[in-house]
């Protein structure tokens, strides 16, 4: 059956305009083309490659500039005690830092208590779950300044927390007690770019979206993409080994990062900014800093291999009746789209309901209700070839009744709108009050079962319901199906000890039994430190601690977290 005719049997004429508009664009395309990629698709626009809006329009830090209403981490977890090895801050310490960094490089509430309000955004995380007591934020402007600051802190036993865009989700980028915050926000230089090899060298404080915009002007793209791209720093991305939306196509940062520049706790500058794809000379030490979450040193510079920006990009948003059908769709996508498949995102009905509730005026990608939704992206160099492959795939999955309904972006605006809808889930989840987040990897056949079992667990404890008397409101799941990465989210009206006890270690035990990972891409931070044993055996954890003690014998780097 012809694709257009087949789709015509599925979509009502009255729905077609909404489907074509894909939340924002207004066209007069005939209804018969509502579920196909037209000649005006974003794929035909060379500069449109992955030009979607993320949550960058919402500055993750400054929308919550005052976080004094967040419970202190030390109060939420009273069993945690400040390490007595660390010295308290003094006026003499502050004077030294101002001498090195200048007045503009220091936010000081030690000698100027009125500045505490300016420090609060650095003390709290955007999830409103963790909040420290820091009275000092240092903002070095160069690697050499980072070196001087760290050496002094190490010599005087001052604990530090490296901080990038502070978009982390596990409490890894904010203080627990009175640690000194070392913000990389002033280190924003793009040092060099080779437009033949695609090698980019940047300061750690360069914002991900700024780097991608710079590359777009030169026909390249950054091989990492996430919803926080408008705020997160590349140094933070590397330090947490962020995964994101492009991992299916471009792999992890362990493969794309060519070199790092880092400062060790004793002030030693590690200059390993290799620009070569091949360098088999000795131990690959840069890998230790990728995903170390600032516990071994501070990443100050990154060299990374960037691919050509695809000239042809297509995005489809599909509705499916079950998780089993989503699995079938993914298998077909890998088989039929193969080399042009760049993203395959999974969303359940609960996550979509929350987005619609928080954004009632936003246009929905699909009018009908479905149990599951998938966003599929293809990217390549030949628009005609890619469009034909995508149309053939969609015709096939509709014919096999794998997919119930769907829409394909007709232009750049619609590509942007569909991705914005997907990426808006994270922000919308927090509007009820708070979120317990679990970023996990599970074998695909059982991936969504964790969501259902977690919901059952909370129901059995009487902790979840529609009224305000219940602390938990919703259990939803979404994530990157392309790399078996589930984001399990429990939206709560308030953080509650009973909810946390019901979830932990239940979730981690469930994952461990299926040989999954308790942290797929968000890291360990404070949230998962004590649960690392569910994914790493005693030998592995012991080796990690040996590495930590070798690099940071005084333990000043991001204490109380990771391992």
Regions found by a protein language model. Give the residues of each.
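Noncatalytic alpha-helical scaffold of FAD-dependent oxidoreductases
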Residues: 2-563
